[in-house]
């Protein structure tokens, strides 16, 4: 029997995911970062779901592009970062660090995780140990720092590392295969200051290959595994993080 509360992934564009939290008991749903409305509406209607809320992590168009159409179709509230009021005028409620949000059966705590953007937030669900992290962290990688500093990017990852090891991270891009190639470049460099668990990385690579061959997502990520293989989580200080991020930017 299907779980009462679960997360479904709706692929959009080339490598984005929209996350649809679904409550089987009430047929209510919550959408996280719907960059495109059409596939989300199709999924909701096919599964006879009513959209109860939209959660946004940051203002980039591939995360908010479908909000207006979805809000008009389902008349649901939109939650967004307080620091992005100008960029996301369609939102109804503005969120900051430590705020609590209840949507249907789900309770979330808001975490401000700047770096990728200055106003970036994530949504933490304690009950299921779910983190909806936007573009802060990816499988074996992290988001580019378009607005924030290296210090902010590093500290945001340190905050994620403090979550329970069983945390499931729902990041919104399928970048894991590309990031694996970067990890292997690091492994083959004699002078790299960051090395992870090579055996764990190969197990990770095998699992990733198996999933992608079946057209299955690499998301959600398991925090306990990312901590042993993700070079950006293994960085011991801001300077190591800067080294990695600048190297990755050149790839």
Swiss-Prot record:
Question: Which family, according to the similarity comment?
Answer: Belongs to the metallo-beta-lactamase superfamily. Glyoxalase II family.
Q: Which organism is it from?
A: Bdellovibrio bacteriovorus (strain ATCC 15356 / DSM 50701 / NCIMB 9529 / HD100)
Quote the InterPro entries the UniProt record gives: Clx_II_MBL, Glyoxalase_II_hydrolase, HAGH_C, Hydroxyacylglutathione_Hdrlase, Metallo-B-lactamas, RibonucZ/Hydroxyglut_hydro
Q: Where does Zn(2+) 1 bind?
A: 58, 60, 116, 135
Instruction: Tell me how the cofactor is bound.
Output: Binds 2 Zn(2+) ions per subunit.
Quaternary structure? Monomer.
* The keyword Zinc is assigned to this record: yes
Q: What is the lineage of its organism?
A: Bacteria, Pseudomonadati, Bdellovibrionota, Bdellovibrionia, Bdellovibrionales
A single GO BP annotation from the record? Answer: methylglyoxal catabolic process to D-lactate via S-lactoyl-glutathione
- Cofactor(s) named in the record: Zn(2+)
What name does the UniProt record give this protein?
Hydroxyacylglutathione hydrolase
Keyword terms of this UniProt record? Hydrolase, Metal-binding, Zinc
- Chain positions recorded as Zn(2+) 2 binding sites: 62-63, 135, 173
Q: What the protein does?
A: Thiolesterase that catalyzes the hydrolysis of S-D-lactoyl-glutathione to form glutathione and D-lactic acid.
Show the disulfide pairing. Answer: none
Q: What is its EC number?
A: 3.1.2.6
Write down a Pfam family by its short name.
Answer: Lactamase_B
